[in-house]
Regions:
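Divalent metal-binding segments
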Residues: 2-5, 10, 14-17, 21-25, ...
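Non-catalytic terminal/interface segments that mediate subunit docking, oligomerization
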Residues: 281-283
Length: 283
């Protein structure tokens, strides 16, 4: 057994408690508390003072993936991320480290003539280079081709998709709406030209038939990576408040023991109640 001393140890309980000592045995934390109390309780334990001047925080906390939104991505999109995804018992998806890697995966997917639309997640301009509607039109011009940025804050799409989902109606002077030299849409929409309009993609992106599949992939990936906690910015931003509540009711279990925290998106809830502040507060 070892007892580690920290200047301040932050806990993840409801009171946001702090401590100064961590008791560890066989690779597992068995108790956290006052360092002096712990060394008296476990007098035979080895004292580790290497971190006595350091602040210690919980590890393996995933702060920003939006589990429900990511589950939609994983369930409905083909990955083109520059990161390697390990889904444990469901297999792995190798990284698309280069532009060629990404284009090869795009070409393979759009060759599937049975699909009505082609969604991809993980586009990264730094790794994959600039891509526009023109290049995507060359791959497929009679069905939607949509590349979601890995950040979740942007999209590239072919001309067919722009027209089908209404992105060709976004004011051209909107921040994040990229144009060609001739002043036409080039297929890239980011931030202000994308975030308020993500619901336009609902018919294909928020396909609930594949939500459970995406959820299982998300949980298995979290398990492989040792994730112990995550948070969600609640408020119906993806498919409505009630759907979010249903999704998270049985989110974790004994196979996937992930601690969930929920932060309410006040504006989304307020919109649900026609901007009635009292009803929003009561909800």
């Amino acid at each position: 057994m070892k007892i580690f001393k920290g200047k301040k140890v932050y806990l993840m309980d409801n009171e946001f408690s702090t401590a100064t000592g961590i008791a560890e045995e066989e690779g597992k934390i068995i108790e956290i508390g006052n360092f002096e109390d712990l060394i008296h309780k476990y007098p035979e334990a080895e004292k580790v003072l290497s971190y006595q001047n350091d602040y210690i925080y919980p590890g393996f906390v995933e702060p920003h993936s939006h589990p429900m939104l990511t589950s939609y991505f994983l369930g409905n999109c083909t990955l083109i991320d520059f990161k390697h995804w390990d889904f444990g018992k469901y297999g792995v998806v190798p990284a698309c480290l280069t532009r060629k890697d990404m284009l090869d995966r795009l070409k393979k997917e759009v060759s599937n003539k049975e699909k009505d639309a082609f969604l991809f997640f993980g586009y990264n301009q730094q790794h994959h280079g600039k891509i526009t509607a023109k290049e995507l039109d060359n791959l497929e011009d009679k069905k939607p081709v949509v590349l979601l940025y890995g950040t979740g804050h942007g999209v590239v799409m072919n001309t067919y998709a722009m027209k089908k989902f209404g992105f060709d109606l976004i004011p051209k002077d909107t921040f994040g709406c990229e144009l060609t030299e001739s002043g036409d849409y080039n297929g890239n929409f980011t931030e202000t030209a994308y975030m308020p309009y993500i619901s336009y993609l609902a018919p294909v992106l928020y396909n609930n038939e594949n939500l459970e599949k995406g959820k299982q992939l998300y949980l298995e990936n979290a398990k492989v990576n040792g994730i112990i906690a995550t948070a969600e910015y609640m408020g119906g931003g993806t498919s409505g408040i009630e759907k979010e509540i249903e999704f998270y009711q049985n989110f974790s279990d004994e196979n996937y023991p992930i601690h969930m925290s929920f932060l309410t998106n006040y504006q989304h809830v307020n919109n649900e109640f026609n901007n009635d502040n009292q009803k929003t507060f009561e909800y």
